Amino acid sequence: MKKIIVSGEGGQGVRVISLTLAQLLVNLGYEVSLLYDYDSAVRGGLSLAHLVYDKKSIDNPVIDEADILLKLSDKAEGLHAKTTVYQTGLGSKDGKSLKLEDIPPTNEEIPFSELGTEIFGKELFGYMIALGRLMVLADINPPESDIRAVLPKKYKEENMNAIIFGQRLHEEGQKRLGEEKSGRRIKLSERGKQKKSS
């Protein structure tokens, strides 16, 4: 059983990322549980998605420790995961990138917002880059046609290209392009560098 938490603020794509991934997993034959915890009154309020999936029936969808935590904001406290993927600046108190030696080898720091803006023209595509990276770390490698089938109709082509970009971040040329375009360093885990995407 795999457990993923997506953490952010309202308007950061938490629901789109998690729902797209959940629909994809269902189409791939997995049992899926997706639970949301969010403040519906305020844009910018806490937004969490708890996603559990397995080939067998899911008895308990509660997540104490996730396999992967995608952290797009610092709003949520006390979340634990084996691997955490931070939006750049969230792992430090001053909002700047952490020193490479201060980031555990299982964790990653990626400037999703800047990549979305600089490479695809809108910050919202950074969330699809995050989805692509999440798919690699979770070892979800469906054919492109399966991914396209669950993408929102609006900006389908741009979203697909952003997901592919996220899936290929472990490739040196792709990583370098991302760093040049965003002006920020990208730190990937060894685990993520070894994954191959389709």
List where the protein language model places each region.
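Active-site cofactor/cluster-binding pocket
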Residues: 1-198
